[in-house]
Amino acid sequence: MTSQKLSLQDIILTLQQYWANQGANLMQAYDNEVGAGTQSPYTFLRANGPEPWHAAYVQPSRRPADGRYGDNPNRLFQHHQFQVVMKPSPDNIQELYLGSLEALGIKPLEHDIRFVEDNWENPSMGAAGIGWEVWLDGMEVTQFTYFQQVGGIEVDSVTAEVTYGLERLASYIQDVPTVYDLDWGNGVLYGDIFKEPEYEHSKYAFEASDQAMLLRHFDDFEKEATRLLDLGLVHPAYDYILKSSHTFNLLDASGSVSVTERAGYLHRIRTMARRVSKVFIDERAKLGFPLLKDDDLREIYLGEHGKYTLTEEN
């Protein structure tokens, strides 16, 4: 708890201003269903290849299996993450993070802030890295990750990802008993906005979804993603990979897939994720990696014997 009880809206605005001052470009939430801010193309795709990338954005994240009809004080079908990606990772990224807490009125020297080792992996997306959970006075509020692999490809430049759980952070700052009691802003409560959708999405995920339709959709989305990748259309293909992932999560939440089938679906998603990462790098290389300004790095990656130098065989 802090002496200044910022609304959730004020927390977002403060984090946006803070990270913009650190050089992050403020992006908008991606307009597709994702399970975490990591799945946004502003993180997943941009972590591939050698180009620098600094961004921050709020991302609504849907996890059908976590829905609880609005009855659980802090477990949600949809929650909100504030995502920061810094590539290459600044040497002082942890200090920058602590500075963001101070901007929110949380003075590090007055609180028990612990970095608890928690190496991260998302098998379905072929992504992994070393990381830490950040605990604030006993509550996990942030996940830190240094990406080592994305889409099954070892990264060229380490991306630091800082993911704030906005509901958890706001619950700590405002000291409220449930997420639905949070002050979103201007006297409007979190529950006024999200409790009814939370109930309805939970009912859909667990009771009302059309399983046969979802199974057909998964196959269709996979076929379309594959077709688009054959055409080199990375971003439309990635949209269909995200749709495949969300459709699988709905099937999984309702218990419609067996343990064996589950492994098969995850493998299919992982195969698409690995391919889109490779095609993304290839397409950026064809453009000459326009965000890569450093001459020495350009020589390493695009010089005569560079890692991504195009040849007739390419």
UniProtKB/Swiss-Prot annotation:
It is an enzyme of class 6 (ligase). Its main location: cytoplasm. Tetramer of two alpha and two beta subunits. InterPro entries: aa-tRNA-synth_II/BPL/LPL (IPR045864), Gly-tRNA-synth_heterodimer (IPR006194), Gly-tRNA_ligase_asu (IPR002310). GO terms for cellular component: cytosol. This is Glycine--tRNA ligase alpha subunit. NCBIfam families: glyQ, PRK09348.1. Its EC number is 6.1.1.14. Belongs to the class-II aminoacyl-tRNA synthetase family. The gene is glyQ. One of its GO terms (molecular function) is ATP binding. PROSITE patterns: AA_TRNA_LIGASE_II_GLYAB. One of its GO terms (biological process) is glycyl-tRNA aminoacylation. It is found in: Cytoplasm. The keyword Protein biosynthesis applies. Gene3D superfamilies: Bira Bifunctional Protein, Domain 2, Class II aaRS and biotin synthetases, domain 2. The keyword Signal does not apply. It comes from Leuconostoc citreum (strain KM20). It catalyses: tRNA(Gly) + glycine + ATP = glycyl-tRNA(Gly) + AMP + diphosphate. Keywords: Aminoacyl-tRNA synthetase, ATP-binding, Cytoplasm, Ligase, Nucleotide-binding, Protein biosynthesis.
